[in-house]
Amino acid sequence: MTTSAIAALTPEMIREHGLTPEEFEKIKQLLGGREPTRTELGIFSVMWSEHCSYKSSRVHLKRLPTRSKLVVQGPGENAGIVDIGDGWACAFKIESHNHPSFIEPFQGAATGVGGILRDIFTMGARPVAVMDSLRFGPILTATNAGRDTRATQAEIHKNHSVMEGVVSGVASYGNCFGVPNLGGEVKFELCYSGNPLVNAFALGLVRRDQIFYGRASGVGNPVIYVGSKTGRDGIHGATMASEEFSEGSEAKRPNVQVGDPFLEKLLLEACLEAMQTGVIVGIQDMGAAGLTCSTCEMGARGGTGVEIELDRVPQRETGMTPYEIMLSESQERMLLIAQKGREEEVFRIFQKWGLDAVEIGRVTDDAKMRVLEHGVVVAEIPNAALTDNAPVYKRPLARWEPPVDREMPERIRFAESKDFSSQLKRLLASPNICSKRWVWQQYDHMVQTNTVEAPGAGDAGVIRIKGSNRGLAMALDGNSRWCYLDPRLGAMHAVAEAARKVACAGATPIGATNCLNFGNPEKPHIMWQFSQVIDGITKACEELDTPITGGNVSFYNETLGEGIYPTPVIGVVGILEDVHKTAKMHFAQTGRKIVLLRANEVGDAVDAELEFGSSEYAKEILGAVWGYPPELDLEKEATLQRALVALIQAGLVESAHDCADGGLAVALIESALPAGVGLNIRLPEQKLPFEFLLFGEDASRVVISCDPISLPRIQQIAQEYGVFADVVGETGSDRVEIAVDGNAVISASVAELREAYEGALERALRTEPSVVAAD
């Protein structure tokens, strides 16, 4: 057999495939001096794209901690796996689907969920939970002096549309597939107007001795295509995800995949059933780069080659070329390596589930990907040329200072006569703090009947492990504004807060996954931000013993040269020894003591001024951003988390809520509103403005509540751990009363605070941008 005729490749064709002249020359060298066929050019284009090759990030990702005594599988497979005891393990991962979700919000978000679910069950794990971290541009024009008004009405209208489409897509796919969505986070900043972020997380359970890997082994074993038929949707999706957006990006809708969650549910059941027979040797999802990626990566991992015949590939459109078949990213497809002679067992199982299952090739011993059509070779590439020998760039770094004041602007003045009650209500209604009920009420969070803590009930999502009293807690977190101000410190906070949320459920963090969203890596300051974020994640994960088991990098989140804030999103998973000993977020009843657990001494006024500029209060109420994120002592953070888990597992704590966005005042109100419980809070005098006490976002703090009888024991255990346990008040009545040194500073009914907090997002999305008036 000979390689099919080569059409002339022009510099324009090479450029359109996202390849540089230098990369094209390297391709020719790897092919023994010949030029690639058009099909091979497409294959190199997707496999060498930033999305698939990690060519700009790989040198930095090597610094991440990836090992612990519990890690079964780290980065490099479809998902990471950690041992959770009793013969079980959990597979989990977070990935981005940012670019498709801007072009086609519903399908982009839906297929993002579908893709992460396939990554989980490809490992042999049954998905039991999903979460999502979403970032959008502003959804309101100015409703107070602080809100950024640079977003145009057209941008806000677009942001409404994108958000509604994304949330609907996430809900539709997860609900139809039958996996509970346990929440996540939703944030708004101006930088996401042209670059929304959709980061999907999934977790599944697998028996420790029944894990499957994406490796092609056993020369002569059949290669079997299963699942949906191949169409033209998603062609060059991976390449699109490695480019900036321009004014013509809307024309890229054909690059966005179309998902079918019902078919994916069938695929899940068929795959898990086939795995139980022992016939499956290896399995790989056809995700980014489709058949191309699954073929070459399985061969590379297994040290073998894979030969496939495109005439056998099930197709739903006529006249598809080899180029289109290899680059299609049609959803709900898998590639299996089966034991030779047992093919019929596979066919029967998938036929029972109404799915295509076709032998399209075999495993070879030459470490090459070989693609044939009508018996003619249309692509023949060494696996290493597409994987290990892909370009790796150590791009230049340039330290960058954000264009903000590092010290508090002179125009900012604090006065004790301010109406803090009104400011609190404005803050509760602000997009980043207000209730995201409108989002998570669209998700089915009770399907599978394992959910212990649903969205809005706790800082982390919690599921029980059936057949035992044990459970798993999971949380997502990331503060991009803090990473904008200080990438390293902001990344440390993302890890710490995600782990703290898990600890608030009474679970011990055991592993992490990261989704790293950035602008153009060809810009030195972007790569400096990226490197700093990696350093921050590394430091925090080492200190908190949460190794990174896998994740995703999404570069080129820019539109017309304007990039997003550096946005690392961290997912942390923790083990809960007894699901009956967990803590909700809300105060359950009156007559309970409220305690502020904190790891640190109260800071001085100078530090507080510098750190306050990164708070939600500064942005929303004062209309300014300055300074740095709060300082973070990771050793003390780890101690706080251990103390919190010990208190909850001892049955002493009824509720626990991370003190984060909006500071202490917001944490108290968020804890009070679900059950409609009032508060009587008395804070001691400190040499700080009241704003800092109420709304400062100091690190390593948790608000807990307890029966008064339990208070002495809580204080004793806290002292043993070296953690401060300040009694700040108690629950009662139907009002919130907060005093500082005996001076009333906040007085409001629970009802009016609930109205501000719970209805804000719905009101914003119901309101046309052109009629939103400023106060």
Model-inferred region functions:
Residues 2, 7, 77-142, 155-355, ...:
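Mobile "lid/hinge" segments at catalytic clefts and subdomain interfaces of large enzymes
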Residues 45-49, 62, 351, 517, ...:
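Short amphipathic alpha-helical surface patches that mediate protein-protein
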Residues 5-17, 23, 33, 38-41, ...:
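Glycine-/charge-enriched secondary-structure boundary and capping motifs
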Residues 149-151:
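Short, low-complexity intrinsically disordered segments enriched in A/P/G/S/L with frequent Arg
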